[in-house]
Regions:
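Signal-transmission linkers at sensory-effector interfaces
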Residues: 1-38
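Signal-transducing coupling segments at domain and membrane junctions
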Residues: 99-121
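Helix-loop-beta substructure at the N-terminus of cytosolic sensory domains
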Residues: 42-80
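A short, aliphatic-rich beta-strand micro-motif
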Residues: 120-131
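Allosteric regulatory "coupling" segments in signal-transduction proteins
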Residues: 74-102
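Sensory beta-strand/linker motifs that couple input domains to effectors
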Residues: 133-143
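Regulatory loop-to-helix N-cap segments in sensory/regulatory domains
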Residues: 143-159, 169-175
Length: 175
């Protein structure tokens, strides 16, 4: 009987944990929905990089977020997001098959942030047009918390955020 009670207790704890994860995922999905609506309601393409980054910061509590793009249409080449990436940045972003999450080990992308020294952990999310293999940009999320973006974390929601950001920002690419 004691063994059965222990098994039941273990199952109750697992069930409670599953419910908690479900609630967390629902909350993330709600924030994702609000941020997506913010992107869709942005009429001016030139405003999209700032709306995307500031919206992620606000809706998801990310202390720092920025976007860097390359190969944009001439009308958008003067935007801050289209300036300052090295010649290596496109190849680095394209090499990422999924978001990089981990420590800021002096990566170039951290220098694009307002306060690079405060970026202990990073999520670097490649931006691709549709199913194309080449990245046309990088979404950079940063936190002073070294565990916020850890190498062992799941990246499903970050991948969705990257897909949505890329879809919105593809308006800045040449026709």
């Amino acid at each position: 009987a004691e063994l059965l009670r222990e098994k039941i207790k273990g199952l109750e704890l697992k069930g409670a944990e599953m419910i908690r994860h479900g609630h967390e995922n629902t909350a993330i999905a709600d924030r994702l929905q609000r941020w997506t609506l913010q992107l869709l309601n942005t009429r001016e393409a030139a405003e999209l990089p700032e709306v995307a980054a500031s919206g992620i910061a606000a809706h998801f509590g990310v202390p720092q977020a920025t976007v860097k793009l390359w190969g944009v249409a001439p009308d958008f080449a003067a935007l801050p997001c289209a300036q300052g990436a090295s010649a290596d940045a496109p190849a680095f972003a394209t090499s990422l098959s999924k978001p990089y999450c981990g420590a800021n080990r002096g990566l170039e992308a951290a220098t694009w942030l307002a306060d690079p020294a405060a970026a202990a952990s990073l999520a670097l999310i490649p931006l691709r047009a549709g199913d194309g293999p080449q990245a046309f940009g990088l979404l950079v999320l940063a936190s002073p918390d070294p565990q916020r973006f850890a190498a062992d974390m799941g990246t499903d929601f970050l991948e969705r955020i990257g897909e949505l950001t890329a879809a919105a920002l593809s308006r800045l690419l040449p026709a």
